[in-house]
């Protein structure tokens, strides 16, 4: 059985020529049968790619030939199914969109905490633990005792941080803060923001939830549930074993068994989370895309229009 290697990586580094990097990088990926998304901006690179191991490693080697990316770190995972069906290299203002000018993780960032030391940190009652991910991600799993900002995008986090009572007690004393996200990139910016706002004791989970699940055995873990990932696996658990969630191809939210059993679920068209907010014309269009995808699947072809990729990947490697 063919297996696909997924590699996730990011690096904050000055890339003033980022637009010129796009075409040769796309050519390299296509030549090596690698699919996924690479985001490029003046502040760095952020990506999740997948394909045959030799192809993925060839792309990583190509990137590391640039002296600015020579120390690029990546995470690996295996999948029996193709996580992505297209290769996209996109030029962006930010490699993870927060929308706050002047925040540079290369200048100031929170203190990295290794997975082995994370339990002790978040077990401290004086530490405010914040899950920086979107609400649909938090909904299927998080750390015990973590605060959920209940946001729909990472760009909403700065406003929440400015108003969160736990961060602005009546005493005026700024608390210790521990932040986490899927792979680490969102915390690079969120901890940098808090440091810029005068919070001195700010920490974040090195390597994110994925590194924690890979490193910490279940019997020692404070993680509850599954971790949402932005590829065909949808969710993973301890040991990065693929979880039991499916993905609504209409709204791109994770679905559990109860969602799939709901009369509001129609494959590729709607689910209990989006049925009421989509119009009939949207459902009709989705129904036709699903039909085309099923025809292509029956012919053992790839139908790009109904591929399993998320429409947007707000934080590819940093999820």
Swiss-Prot record:
Its EC number is 1.14.-.-. It is an enzyme of class 1 (oxidoreductase). GO terms for biological process: tRNA modification. The keyword Transferase does not apply. The active site is at 181 (cysteine persulfide intermediate). It holds the Pfam family Rhodanese. It catalyses: uridine(34) in tRNA + AH2 + O2 = 5-hydroxyuridine(34) in tRNA + A + H2O. Residues 298-319 are annotated as: Disordered. The keyword tRNA processing applies. Residues 123-221 form the Rhodanese domain. GO terms for molecular function: oxidoreductase activity, acting on paired donors, with incorporation or reduction of molecular oxygen. Keywords: Oxidoreductase, tRNA processing. Catalyzes oxygen-dependent 5-hydroxyuridine (ho5U) modification at position 34 in tRNAs. Belongs to the TrhO family. This is tRNA uridine(34) hydroxylase. It comes from Albidiferax ferrireducens (strain ATCC BAA-621 / DSM 15236 / T118).
């Amino acid at each position: 059985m063919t297996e696909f290697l997924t590699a996730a990586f990011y690096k904050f580094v000055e890339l003033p020529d980022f637009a010129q990097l796009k075409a040769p990088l796309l050519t390299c990926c296509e030549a090596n049968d690698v699919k996924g998304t690479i985001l490029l901006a003046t502040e760095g690179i952020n990506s999740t790619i997948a394909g045959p191991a030799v192809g993925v490693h060839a792309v990583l080697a190509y990137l590391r030939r640039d002296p600015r990316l020579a120390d690029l770190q990546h995470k690996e995972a295996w999948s029996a199914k193709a996580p992505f069906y297209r290769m996209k290299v996109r030029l962006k203002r930010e490699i993870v969109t927060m929308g706050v000018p002047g925040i540079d993780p290369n200048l100031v960032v929170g203190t990295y905490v290794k997975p082995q030391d994370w339990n002790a940190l978040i077990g401290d009652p004086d530490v405010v633990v914040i899950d920086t991910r979107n609400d649909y991600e938090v909904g299927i799993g998080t750390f015990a005792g973590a605060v959920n900002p209940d946001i729909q995008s990472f760009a909403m986090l700065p406003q929440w941080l400015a108003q969160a009572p736990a961060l602005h007690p009546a005493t005026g004393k700024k608390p210790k803060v521990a932040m986490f996200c899927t792979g680490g990139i969102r915390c690079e910016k969120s901890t940098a923001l808090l440091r810029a706002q005068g919070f001195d004791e700010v920490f974040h989970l090195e390597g994110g939830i994925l590194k924690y699940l890979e490193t910490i055995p279940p019997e020692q873990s404070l993680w509850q549930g599954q971790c949402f990932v932005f590829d065909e696996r949808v969710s993973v658990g301890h040991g990065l074993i693929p979880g039991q969630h499916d993905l609504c191809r209409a709204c791109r939210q994770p679905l559990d068994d109860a969602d799939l059993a709901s009369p509001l679920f129609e494959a590729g068209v709607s689910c209990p989370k989006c049925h009421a907010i989509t119009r009939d014309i949207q459902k009709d269009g989705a129904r036709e895309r699903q039909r085309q995808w099923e025809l292509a699947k029956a012919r053992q072809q790839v139908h790009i229009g109904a591929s399993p990729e998320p429409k947007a990947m707000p934080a590819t490697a940093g999820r």
